[in-house]
Amino acid sequence: MGQGWTVGFAKKPPSVHAWVMPWAIFLLLGVTVFRCIRPWVGGPENFAPLAALALCGSLYFPRPWNWVGPILALFVSDVFLNLHYGLGPITGSTWMAGIAYLLIISIGNGFAQRRSWPIWLMGSLGATFLFYLVTNTGAWWTLPGYEKSFAGWSQALTTGLPGYPPTWTFLRASLVSDLLFTVLFVGGVEWSVRRFPGKARPILSAATNR
């Protein structure tokens, strides 16, 4: 007889938000800094934890931080990066990303009552494709380099504009980062509340395997 994790999530106790909030603030700051320093530390484009944060925030963050936190992290880091690249503080891509993250937050809110690892990992994949579709459709609609036709839209979703990496490579990086950070965020909180059981009960349930 051994101990293992079930795929189900246990009922969330009221005390978990009070305990997680300092950790959530640290996480929001970490995500913002991570995104700001990426041009200097390198790594693939679109390898960022924001989509995972938007998805998982509804599970752990109290309202209104479940949506204010990810959107604030987006705008703060976008202002920094846009100014670094010589652009305006807020660009069209910032607004499109904001719309995508709000939709992802809505997915997370819907999944908050369906607490299981398979559901949330599938939600992570769905969030990746949703962000990719919304932001690249916005680029197709606003950038003059794309023909305003189905062929131009297909180009925006696959090869992108000449002189830039194909857009499908951004999708690949997003898939990896969203899955990775979803597991890290959820796993980190669950490990913490089990490591310090006097603070709050874990949301993921522990079970006995026979």
Question: What kind of region is each of these model predictions?
Answer:
Residues 24-26, 67-71, 94-99, 121-125, ...:
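Hydrophobic alpha-helical transmembrane segments
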